[in-house]
């Protein structure tokens, strides 16, 4: 059957090592699959690390695909017979300015960035990706909370929400005992004040468990390792 698997991953999750283990294997097997990279410049909290910076740089190359197509066409139509070597070198030189060179060097084609809110562009791009019949990453830029201005401006607070007032975005407060995360945050902060060897490590979630209180008080004793839980555990022992 003419089916191509489609998987989706967020830019925040691109900091996890397992992603590159999978891409490494996929680039070798050349199995046809479309990977949608949903890039909203957010994980849960503000993304950090080299991969996040790399994805941001890709935005500077948003017009690259059209440019590359023109160069490829020029090489095909204008290079005479017997100049295959020169054409190949030109193609390799072009790769030096490829925004998706990280993925292409792993054997995975790259398309993008595209507007993740433009349905027509998404459909056209996915059809192109499917027809390529090999592993390809479609880099889609999106805005978290798109369509609701209040959420667009407060990404972290609107990652997961309960009841709220649509008009002003105010959350409906309920009488409830102190949350376990709040108890943890207070205890951690108190211990950190008492012992200078108490540190905090989080995997892109400083607010959820309340560890942000430690970050505010003792920023040099706090690390956010992005969405990389395995690394977080090994980082603790450094």
Task: Briefly describe each language-model feature range.
Residues 113-118, 203, 226-227:
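Short beta->alpha junction loops
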């Amino acid at each position: 059957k003419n089916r191509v698997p489609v998987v989706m991953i967020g830019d925040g999750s691109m900091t996890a090592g397992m992603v590159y283990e999978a891409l490494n294997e996929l680039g070798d097997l050349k199995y046809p699959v479309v990977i949608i990279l949903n890039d909203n410049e957010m994980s849960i909290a503000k993304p950090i690390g080299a991969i996040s910076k790399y994805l941001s740089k890709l935005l500077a190359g948003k017009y690259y695909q059209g440019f590359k197509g023109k160069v490829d066409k020029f090489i095909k139509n204008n290079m005479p017979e017997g100049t295959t070597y020169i054409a190949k070198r030109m193609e390799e030189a072009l790769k030096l300015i490829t925004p998706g060179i990280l993925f292409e060097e792993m054997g995975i084609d790259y398309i993008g960035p595209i507007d993740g809110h433009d349905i027509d562009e998404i459909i056209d791009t996915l059809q192109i990706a499917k027809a390529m019949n090999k592993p390809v990453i479609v880099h889609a830029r999106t805005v978290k909370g798109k369509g609701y201005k209040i959420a667009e401006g407060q990404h972290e607070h609107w990652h997961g929400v309960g009841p709220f007032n649509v008009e002003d975005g105010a959350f409906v407060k309920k009488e409830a005992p102190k949350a376990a995360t709040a108890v943890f945050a207070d205890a951690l902060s108190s211990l950190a004040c008492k012992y200078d060897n108490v540190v905090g490590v989080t995997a892109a979630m400083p607010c959820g468990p309340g560890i942000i209180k430690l970050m505010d008080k003792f920023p040099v004793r706090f690390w956010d390792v992005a969405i990389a839980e395995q690394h977080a555990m090994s980082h603790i022992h450094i």
